[in-house]
From Swiss-Prot:
This is Cytidylate kinase. It is an enzyme of class 2 (transferase). Its EC number is 2.7.4.25. InterPro entries: Cytidylate_kin (IPR003136), Cytidylate_kinase_dom (IPR011994), P-loop_NTPase (IPR027417). GO terms for biological process: nucleobase-containing small molecule interconversion; pyrimidine nucleotide metabolic process. The keyword Flavoprotein does not apply. Belongs to the cytidylate kinase family. Type 1 subfamily. PANTHER family: CYTIDYLATE KINASE, CYTIDYLATE KINASE/PANTOATE-BETA-ALANINE LIGASE. GO terms for cellular component: cytosol. CDD domains: CMPK (cd02020). NCBIfam families: cmk (TIGR00017).
Amino acid sequence: MTAIAPVITIDGPSGAGKGTLCKAMAEALQWHLLDSGAIYRVLALAALHHHVDVASEDALVPLASHLDVRFVSTNGNLEVILEGEDVSGEIRTQEVANAASQVATFPRVREALLRRQRAFRELPGLIADGRDMGTVVFPDAPVKIFLDASSEERAHRRMLQLQEKGFSVNFERLLAEIKERDDRDRNRAVAPLVPAADALVLDSTTLSIEQVIEKALQYARQKLALA
């Protein structure tokens, strides 16, 4: 009998710190890593590259079904490869982020990408980063964590990130964009952004990233020991 690889799902809104937490957990446990948000960003970028309308579900489904994407972990960094090209930086632009949130609202697009996401489940285990990992993609995951933070704190973190990269940003505008995206993600008809019933809800608003990692790893190790 083939062993089923365990999965730790990390869900939550944009800017809560999921990416940093997932990389740290994957390194600590030596597990595979899936950035599901990157898959939607890659699809959005592929649509922009191929001049496919991101507002058209009919046009997006074939593209999603044949999306050539893979993840390569190098020296602790996750490289996102689209059609043989490293697009790790390109998918992180605000234009692609907004388009990704839009394409994620279509039920048939999400269905087309489900199989690709589930294919990342391999031994010794998988850390899955997203918005519906614990509720839709891996509902049988033995460990589920919902990482949250206030919209103000997430806007502040994003502002610091952008400033470090040399960008001039307006906090109020950034906060408005985050609130708008939260509203869209939490109220969409398919796979809305909500914690799984059996998830640990971890609020990172007043915690350092080291504290978040410590709490998440402690919880995961306890749950996996019982599984």
